[in-house]
C-alpha cells in the first residue's frame, strides 16, 4: 500500500508542473474554492510557517478515486527498512494514518519540517522504537524523544500530544527551539490563515508564501530558478484537491501583487500552452513517453481550464484515475533501465 503515498506525491508534482506549462486561454471569475475552517491539526501548527500542507488521509482512503488509481499503479518493491518499522511499531500509514498536517521552513542546508499526525498509534511500541537510538527528555511539560538524524545531521523530536496524535519535528540544525524560525512580520499569521480558509474544505491542500520558497529548489524535474521570472510576481500559491466520485478535482491558484501582473501571468501560461502543444506534435518528443503517457499529456493540455479574478489566476482540472496513471507511466528510458542492485555490507547492517 506504499503506492498510496507515491500516488499523492506524483499528483502534487503533476499539478504544479501543469501550472507552469499549460494554459487554456479563457478568462472569467475565479471558481469558488472549498471554503471552511482550518482542520484541527492545522490549527496546531504555527500560522507563520511559509508552507503548510494538509491531507485528510482517511477520506482519501475511502474514495473511489484513490481505490481505482491504486489498482492501476504497479506495486513498488517492498522496502525492508519500512517493513521493520511496521513490525516494531505496529504502525502502517496506509492503514493507521487518518490525517496529517505539515509546516515546512526553508532552513539551510535542509528544510525544517514540523508535522502533526492523527491516527491509531501504539504508544508503548513507538516509544521503544524511538529509544533504540534516541533519548527521552522534558519539553513544555511533556515527554519528548530526541532521535539523531542519520542523514544530514540534526535531530528529530517526537512527542505524543494525545493518544491518537503525534508531533514530529525534523530539525536538521539540531536546535531545540523551532520558535526561532518564526518571522517577526505577520506575528499572528493572519495572511496564512486567510489563505488556508479559502481551501480548508478540501481533502488535500497546500498553501505557500512564495517569497519564502528557495529559488534553487527542485520540484520533480523542474528547478524553480527556471521559472523564477515566471513566478516573481506571485505572492501566494494554493493547491487543493477533492475526490469527486471516481475523479479528482484539483484547483491551483496563484495570487499576484497586482491585476496587471495577473494578466501577464495569463499571457505567459498561454505561451507555455502553445509551446507544449507544438512540442507534443513532434515525433521526437512523443517517443520520450509511452503511448499512454503521451496521450494523457495531450489530453491534460486540452482539459485544463483557467479563470482570472482581480489579482488571482486559477487553473482547474478534473483528473480521472486513467489520466493520472498515464501521466505517471515510466518513460521508455526508465523501462529499459536495468534494476539497480543494492550492495550488501554486513558491517553496516544496522544504521
Question: What kind of region is each of these model predictions?
Answer:
Residues 104-108, 138-139, 159-161, 241-243, ...:
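Generic beta-strand structural signal
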Residues 154-214:
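A conserved glycine-rich beta-strand in the N-terminal activation segment of trypsin-fold
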Residues 53, 156-172, 300, 304-308, ...:
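An acidic-aromatic pocket/loop used at catalytic or ligand-binding sites
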Residues 110, 121, 140, 159-166, ...:
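Short, solvent-exposed coil/turn segments at beta-strand boundaries
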Residues 207-268:
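A contiguous, surface-oriented mixed alpha/beta subdomain in the mid-to-C-terminal portion of proteins
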Residues 2-9, 13-153, 196-228, 267-301, ...:
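Structural boundary/hinge residues at secondary-structure and domain interfaces
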Residues 119-122, 171-174, 257-261, 319-322:
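Helix N-cap motif at beta-to-alpha junctions
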Residues 51-53, 113-117, 235-239, 246-254, ...:
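One face of beta-strands
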Amino acid at each position: 500500500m506504499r503506492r498510496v503515498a507515491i500516488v499523492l506525491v506524483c499528483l502534487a508534482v503533476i499539478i504544479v508542473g501543469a501550472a507552469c506549462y499549460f494554459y487554456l486561454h479563457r478568462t472569467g471569475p475565479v471558481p469558488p474554492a472549498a471554503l471552511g475552517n482550518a482542520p484541527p491539526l492545522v490549527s496546531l501548527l504555527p500560522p507563520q510557517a511559509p508552507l503548510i500542507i494538509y491531507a485528510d488521509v482517511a477520506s482519501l482512503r475511502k474514495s473511489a478515486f484513490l481505490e481505482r488509481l491504486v489498482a492501476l499503479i504497479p506495486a513498488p518493491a517492498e522496502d525492508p527498512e519500512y517493513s521493520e518499522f511496521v513490525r516494531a511499531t505496529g504502525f502502517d500509514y496506509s492503514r493507521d494514518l487518518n490525517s496529517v498536517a505539515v509546516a515546512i521552513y526553508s532552513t539551510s542546508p535542509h528544510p525544517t519540517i514540523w508535522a502533526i499526525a492523527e491516527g491509531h498509534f501504539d504508544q508503548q511500541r513507538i516509544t521503544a522504537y524511538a529509544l533504540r537510538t534516541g533519548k527521552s527528555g522534558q519539553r513544555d511539560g511533556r515527554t519528548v524523544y530526541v532521535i539523531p538524524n542519520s542523514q544530514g545531521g540534526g535531530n528529530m523530536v517526537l512527542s505524543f500530544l494525545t493518544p491518537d496524535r503525534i508531533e514530529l519535528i525534523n530539525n536538521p540544525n539540531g536546535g531545540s527551539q523551532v520558535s526561532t524560525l518564526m518571522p517577526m512580520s505577520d506575528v499572528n499569521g493572519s495572511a496564512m490563515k486567510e489563505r488556508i480558509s479559502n481551501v480548508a474544505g478540501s481533502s488535500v491542500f497546500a498553501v505557500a508564501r512564495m517569497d519564502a520558497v528557495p529559488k534553487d529548489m527542485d520540484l520533480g524535474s523542474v528547478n524553480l530558478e527556471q521559472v523564477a521570472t515566471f513566478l516573481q510576481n506571485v505572492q501566494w500559491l494554493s493547491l487543493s484537491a477533492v475526490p469527486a466520485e471516481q475523479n479528482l478535482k484539483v484547483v491551483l491558484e496563484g495570487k499576484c501583487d497586482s491585476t496587471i501582473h495577473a494578466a501577464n501571468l495569463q499571457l505567459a501560461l498561454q505561451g507555455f500552452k502553445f509551446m507544449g502543444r507544438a512540442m507534443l506534435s513532434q515525433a521526437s518528443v512523443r517517443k520520450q513517453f509511452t503511448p499512454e503517457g503521451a496521450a494523457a499529456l495531450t489530453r491534460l493540455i486540452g482539459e485544463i481550464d483557467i479563470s482570472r479574478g482581480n489579482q488571482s489566476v486559477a487553473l482547474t482540472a478534473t483528473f480521472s484515475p486513467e489520466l493520472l496513471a498515464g501521466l505517471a507511466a515510466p518513460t521508455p528510458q526508465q523501462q529499459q533501465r536495468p534494476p539497480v542492485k543494492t550492495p550488501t555490507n554486513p558491517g553496516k547492517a544496522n544504521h
